[in-house]
Curated annotation (Swiss-Prot):
Name of the protein: Glutamate receptor 2.3
Gene that encodes it: GLR2.3
Range of residues in the leader sequence: 1-23
InterPro entries reported for this sequence: ANF_lig-bd_rcpt, GABAb_receptor_plant_PBP1, Glu/Gly-bd, Ionotropic_Glu_rcpt, Iontro_rcpt_C, Iontropic_Glu_rcpt_pln, Peripla_BP_I
Organism lineage string: Eukaryota, Viridiplantae, Streptophyta, Embryophyta, Tracheophyta
Species assigned in the record: Arabidopsis thaliana
GO cellular component terms given for this protein: plasma membrane
Tissues showing expression: Expressed predominantly in roots.
Amino acid sequence: MRTEKLFFCILLVFFFCLEFNRGQNNGKTLVDVGVVTDVDTSHSKVVMLCINMSISDFYSSNPQFETRLVVNVGDSKSDVVGAAIAALDLIKNKQVKAILGPWTSMQAHFLIEIGQKSRVPIVSYSATSPILTSLRSPYFLRATYEDSFQVQPIKAIIKLFGWREVVPVYIDNTFGEGIMPRLTDALQDINVRIPYRSVIAINATDHEISVELLKMMNMPTRVFLVHMYYDLASRFFIKAKELGLMEPGYVWILTNGVIDDLSLINETAVEAMEGVLGIKTYIPKSPDLEKFRSRWRSLFPRVELSVYGLWAYDATTALAVAIEEAGTNNMTFSKVVDTGRNVSELEALGLSQFGPKLLQTLLTVQFRGLAGEFRFFRGQLQPSVFEIVNIINTGEKSIGFWKEGNGLVKKLDQQASSISALSTWKDHLKHIVWPGEADSVPKGWQIPTKGKKLRIGVPKRTGYTDLVKVTRDPITNSTVVTGFCIDFFEAVIRELPYDVSYEFIPFEKPDGKTAGNYNDLVYQVYLGRYDAVVGDTTILVNRSSYVDFTFPFIKSGVGLIVEMTDPVKRDYILFMKPLSWKLWLTSFISFFLVGCTVWVLEYKRNPDFSGPPRFQASTICWFAFSTMVFAPRERVFSFWARALVIAWYFLVLVLTQSYTASLASLLTSQKLNPTITSMSSLLEKGETVGYQRTSFILGKLKERGFPQSSLVPFDTAEECDELLSKGPKKGGVSGAFLEIPYLRLFLGQFCNTYKMVEEPFNVDGFGFVFPIGSPLVADVSRAILKVAESPKAMELERAWFKKKEQSCPDPITNPDPNPSFTSRQLDIDSFLFLFVGVLLVCVMALGNFTYCFLAKDQVSYLDKVEMSPCSSSQQMPVKRKTQLNMSQVHDQDSL
């Protein structure tokens, strides 16, 4: 150690003497600049070497410049006040034109005020706190990256892996606190909670660190973001590994405050950090950088070059360029005029006449430095790329990059457009080794195995205990909770990728009665008395304002059930009810129309339709009506009469078969129709209705306009059946409102006399309740989907939603035993086409007959009767034909 210090001092003296002699021999203008640093630290060693190498390299490359920087070192002694004293001394006694440094953000906070008062630019290469930016001092320039820039890559990593909670761990000073406002805003953008902030004192003992780590161990959150100095981080992670916080399941993310100084951390501490992700300042490769690194390794093989050294190198170069461009005129300080009053030492410094001009030239300096593009934008450098590293064994491994505009990518030349929207984290980053040498991505949240069990509230029900039932074991006096909701929850817990310990706590009073309604039960989660609620808890918007629900594990809604009545009155005229009166009337008219038409076509040449008028009238009726039951004895001979009879036979066949089927249905089947068809009819009539006690339905009914006096609560299915069977006239209700799962259970027991007629309210279903922001919500919701898509869900439904009355259908396959239907009479519209067809045949037959009848030539008419389709006599035997012709002639003569 003493050898390194001696070597360091020799180098400083060497560079100082070299530059001083060069300035004197060449007649150059010497310009004093100050460096405020912690001389006895490793950082200071690297920084001072880089500053002097920068001066040497710059003037060697630019021997024509008229100015030469002379470095004056002020030792801050690792103290805020020491930094202020060193700066005052440099300005007052050395009249430095600018100050490089200081090292920490706290020291820079004081120096900014000094630089503002004296107009001396302060150029820092290591103060990264965003708080310094808020001071808005034009004389403070940051030749480094502000910490808030790395918030975006941190946000991208957390979003990529889907972690829902993050605990920041930061040092208790300006450096640690500065990043928090930006970090909080960034995490809120992606709905990530910060349940706790772990603040570590800068001089914390190992015991104090252990106490804080134990707090973190007992939290469910497993994602931690560490923002502190490298020396404190080394002790922190050694303790974390000792206490078991570097095991599988944990996630640690380090900011560049630690990663950039990883080479300064001892090997034991780096081994303890294995599996940690880190944000590292990206230094682009360049030929100048490679040459500088090679020269550094040859000159100082035992000293590790840091990014702060590169920034100090570039800051010194920028200062040399700016001083040369600003010129050498008016480099004095104006003294404060003594008016006889006491003047503070800060006021006694005077004002730099060179400072404003130097500041303007510094803001315009732009060049390609060792650390990348050097250009001040709003007083600081602007990064566009950060490197993502994974600590493995005793070193770091690059696993990707964060690029502004592209996000996380494996390679710098990779474009965001080349990554699919359905990509996984492996498309954005290379392989990661997590703490405990785990390969799978940690969930980021876990119930502490050494912590307490989850306190899960369950409702105390008196009815519909198939869903949730709370009993006491008479032997052990322990609480036994069963039911569909409980079994489904336990199946979901088994699907989680981690163990969850829990206990069911009934929501009841000391006397065993329920302690309130479901709103009261849900509110207990908001108050922190329960960690969750499991049961038949409906997902409602007003409840979601203070708790989080999982995905529904069973569909729900509110159904209206009413009593069913048989609309068919079984009396002595029941046989008339299958057909409507219109169809009856149309059928009778059709009978007479067909009979009369056949008579008109046949009576002149068919003896079966001739005779006395009374005989002919009876024949017409007999022929028309007998076709319903058997073929009539009368034969028809004309073509059109036969066509009409065929059409009529087909109509009668269809009509009689339909009548028979409808009458059989009326005589053998009991068709139940609801007494009420909708909720609006209940409101219009002012009927009394029932609802489930302790449910949200009461509020919904009041919103729809039901007065409190018309609402009757019930608890059990038996109470609901009693109220509906009594009816409103006997103190009962006209209808009852139940949620669909309860309704299925009710109809599985009382299916023969009740029916659901409407679903007036839609709700999401039953869900499990957790506190707002609980990471369990996402995991449990995914597990619900797994169970719902597996045969286990159907097994649970069959086990609990089973019929209790053997005559009832299965409530799973047929939840509504009386599906909606309209028992209607057969009407004319069902046979309209057939009736129209028969009518058309009648019209055509009568038209043809009229045409033949109106023929003037009787002989021609008789010939036509014999030869035309009006007669089918050609088909008759000759003897029979002669008899018919003689009869026709006789009849014609009588006309």
